[in-house]
Amino acid sequence: MLNLKELCHELSISLATGQNWLRLGKISPTGIEEGQPYFSAEDAEEIRRALADAKGGRLQSRRNKSHVSGLEIYTSYLGDNAVNQEVLPHLYECFTEEFLQRNCLGILRHYAKSLLQQAGLPESLAVFPGQSTESLSESERWPSVFLVQGQDFLGYLYLSLQSRGIRKANGAYYTPTRIVHQLIESLDVDWDIRILDPCCGTGNFLLALRDKPCDADRIYGQERDPVAAAIARINLALAFQISDPVFLQKHIREGDSLTDWYGKSWDLILGNPPWGLSFTEKKKRMLKRNFDMASGKRVDSAAVFLEQSLYHTEEGGRIAFVLPEALLQVASHRKLRERMLEQAVIERADFVGNPFSGVFCPSVLLTLRKGKKSDAYAGIFVEMGGICWRIRDGRKITADNFYLTMTDEEYDWYKKIEALPEACYLKGQADFAIGIVTGDNRKWLQTQEEEGHEPILRGTDISAFRIQAPSAFIRFCPEEYQQIAATEFYRAPEKLVYRFVCNRLQVACDRERRLTLNSCNIVIPRIPGLKMEYIMAVLNSEVLQFYWKKRFASAKILRHHLEALPIPPAAAGEQEAIIALISADREQLEKRIRKLYRLPEENSPF
């Protein structure tokens, strides 16, 4: 068996890259012992083959998805090889998309009745708002569904029968079953408590509570989508064998938790608040009046939900939410982090990568306890990519220093890099320029060089130290593009170009005065005494890969990221030696750069 560090050595990748692949679900361990992942020789060989086969040497996430225009089957919602998984593909095959969307309620009612009948509950509980627009006389062609305790089949059905546009507008990213159970199982609480899911969707979190010593009398949910609320009531009935419709109406209420909170205070508030919700101007004005987290230019629904939940949690009570990682990292959410640290203690953070089908949004399962630290508080428990650790209580966590993805050891290395004396910075000592935004790439870009056209660099053309032969060509008409920097930046005799969307710094030097597209941005360093190629070598180094990933944890490389990276000063001779190693010996190059940062060789995380 191989541990993660040994696997990374076998694959010739850095430990930080391996940890990132684990976090994003691109590799899976054979098992976990004492909180550490391990890999069999067979699994390691499979990963090696996948890496060799992957385009551009990048390991791709494996996703088993079926698409129809406007509709998408959420196979990941129920889990791999789940019972009832094949119902949706069968419906897609037998009926048109128009029929399925128009008769969504009738289809839901049909399957709800079947599940209720199997559970020995009255079919009259299958109450949905509105009526199907036509008779569903072809039900004999519909596949059977089987009652599986704890499975949100109706939510899976409803989610897959909505168009992607509607789901996005509603912020409806229903939580996959495995993530629901991971959050529930992570909670160390006395289950004889009052529980609320304020945005319960179809009730998948409430369904998962059936496996806990938790009475249905103590479980409540609220949901603004009337169809989802109806499904949540049916799910609650199935989970707890409830036949009383009045009870179900009371415990699953239709309503908007941002404007009409259910109840006054709760012992546990849990769930997955909507992300990226679209608000009307009238609603935005109302939210800005009532919530501190809505005071900025953009109102983030997840941030406002968290503020609302903090207010309505009992002292000593808990909040357990699925949230975008950005809330913990992005500067615009600094005020929210301040509020969390003022009013609550962070107990746990599970970083789960990208759990939502078709959506790139790294996510975290965050558990807060309202109130001050107790004497028994042992620090924040963190899990990421199958690796677990606890952040020591003495480590300072602030709104600006909210680095939960670092172990204490990694944090110590990070601080060593940050503490470099006499470090140089690109801020105020470099020109930055974005690549050209054409407004219509299909109109402007050609795959063949024609008369009057010239090469243009794209992000995919850039890797560390290297620019591959451009595969796109453009006619240079600066006055006709949607957005363009000053021509002098593109035509500079020497400039650094970098990939804008990337999970690591990828910087190369262009001396051919080439144009760049907006996926490939420009920086022209002007740090006195430092050569451009030397700066390129430092930016591509494993030291700064580690520092950038741990500090910003972003899928995009932004200007302020580059401006904040500490660059070690070096004598002219040392710079020349490092530049020579770019093509001669990358391993020695890394050692020389590490030495400039005054970092020890032993126990390095990169």
Positions of PLM-derived features:
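Polyanion-binding surface elements
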Residues: 1-21
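Signature of N6-adenine DNA methyltransferases within the class I
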Residues: 26, 30-37, 178-179, 216, ...
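Polybasic, glycine- and aromatic-enriched phosphate-binding surface used to engage nucleic acids
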Residues: 15-16, 20, 310, 411-577, ...
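Short coil turns linking two alpha-helices in DNA-binding domains
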Residues: 14-17, 202, 272
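Short helix-start
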Residues: 28-53
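Leucine-rich, amphipathic alpha-helical/linker segments
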Residues: 60-76
